């Protein structure tokens, strides 16, 4: 037992020394710019940022949110180092496509809506209700086209600038808010019910990833990606 514990301690020390050596070699890359989806409401991203800041206090973290296409453009043109986003196109070989999770789709409905009494809701049933999307004004048409023609959400569409505004619209009975379980979702409160969205007898799932440019990758990006993956997958 002594030799096991001593050996484990030496391995931990060696790992820490290796991490520190790599870190010192990248001190000039002391900023990490993170983009995430405007509709993201999980808790793990914030936990990962906090833990990363504790481990690497020398790194300045800059965070921005946006729609899928806004984040994609920021990454392409060097506005951010890494983005947390959904997969909407085939993976590109120019980027690291770091898969986090296949996430279940949910609909947030007012408890006043009769559908809220069910255990799940069918995609076809939701077509009778306005779909509330979180989007900037400039990206509304893009988001509507994707949700309607790719995911199959029908009916009419309404837009909110952020999740708080979107949930207020739900409480007011104006429609439903589609959301994905990227990690741990916060409680919705007494006025809203969150139901799995199904096609037939299967819940709809979507892929969420971290993306970064292969040519601009570094140790800090990889460390942050590993932290977030562990938190989201509860490893």
Segments from the language model and where they lie:
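Beta-alpha-beta core module
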Residues: 92-98, 103-104, 165-215
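Ligand-binding cleft/hinge of the Venus flytrap
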Residues: 49-56, 125, 140-155
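Central regulatory/effector-binding core of bacterial HTH transcription factors
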Residues: 29-89
């Amino acid at each position: 037992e002594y030799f096991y514990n001593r050996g484990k301690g030496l391995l931990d020390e060696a790992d820490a020394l290796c991490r520190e050596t790599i870190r010192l070699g990248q001190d000039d890359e002391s900023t990490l710019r993170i983009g995430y989806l405007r509709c993201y409401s999980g808790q793990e991203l914030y936990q990962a940022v906090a833990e990363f800041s504790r481990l690497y206090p020398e790194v300045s973290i800059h965070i921005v949110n946006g729609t899928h296409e806004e984040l994609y453009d920021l990454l392409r043109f060097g506005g951010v180092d890494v983005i947390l986003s959904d997969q909407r196109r085939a993976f590109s070989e120019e980027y690291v496509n770091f898969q986090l999770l296949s996430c279940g789709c949910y609909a947030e409905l007012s408890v006043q809506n009769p559908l809220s009494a069910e255990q799940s809701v069918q995609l076809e049933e939701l077509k009778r209700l306005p779909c509330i999307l979180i989007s900037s004004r400039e990206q509304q048409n893009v988001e509507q086209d994707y949700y309607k023609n790719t995911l199959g959400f029908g009916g009419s569409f309404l837009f909110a600038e952020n999740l708080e505004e979107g949930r207020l619209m739900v409480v007011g009975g104006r429609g439903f808010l589609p959301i994905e379980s990227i990690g741990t979702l916060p409680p919705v409160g007494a006025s809203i019910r969150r139901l799995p969205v199904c096609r037939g007898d299967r819940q709809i799932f979507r892929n969420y990833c971290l993306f970064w440019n292969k040519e601009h990758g570094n140790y800090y990006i990889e460390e942050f990606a590993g932290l977030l993956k562990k938190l989201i997958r509860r490893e």
